[in-house]
Amino acid sequence: MNPYLDFLLSRVYDGATLHPEGLADLRKSGLTDETIARQKIRAVPPDMIDTLLGFVAPKVRHAYLIPFADPRGGWLDYVRMKVFPALETKKGTIKYLQPRQSGVRVYFPLVAVDAVLHSAEPLYVVEGEKKSLAVAQLGLPTVGICGIEGWHRAGSLALHPDLDDVGLRDRFVDLIPDGDWRWNFAVNRAVHRLAEALEDRGARVRVVLLPEMAK
């Protein structure tokens, strides 16, 4: 594992104070202090931001780390952080950064791992790490994907190997995209591709439109 990531996840940083702006952002998403602590979401020391990313991000003032749990135990060697302020580029606003060429991984809320892997209860696949944590806090088996294309590796439309241990046959799977999939072509296409990939594994897929998206 990246030694800097390993150090940041160590007990040395247990109980460390989050930047007020970062903490407010997490609470705005409905996350409890217990969830934040359990998932080891913590402030990245400013002098460690560039080191963890592997490149210089001069406009970033502060950031918090979003560690990715390995459903088999421990933590993945994977760096992803929310940065403040968000970065404005010609292609749009960037709120999250990670090392280049690091690909995507599936996000497993720890409180839900056992139910995700071993239960026949409906599974919720939620776009966004924080949203997936908020759903998991309700006691629902939940996994998160980073962006609507975050369920597969580049160059493949098969489900990400991180989902190999998740029982899907004859299981209801509710997809919760972060956007109105009915009107956005790119989101609509990605949702249908994800549904097809899940159905290929025997899942019974439903797409959930959140109330604020139905307006």
Question: Model-derived features: where do they sit?
Answer:
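Phosphate-handling DNA/RNA-contact segment within nucleic-acid enzymes
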Residues: 51-172, 187
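N-terminal structured subdomain of primase-like DNA metabolism proteins
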Residues: 1-71, 75-80, 88-99, 133, ...
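TOPRIM fold recognition
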Residues: 1-18, 26, 30, 116-123, ...
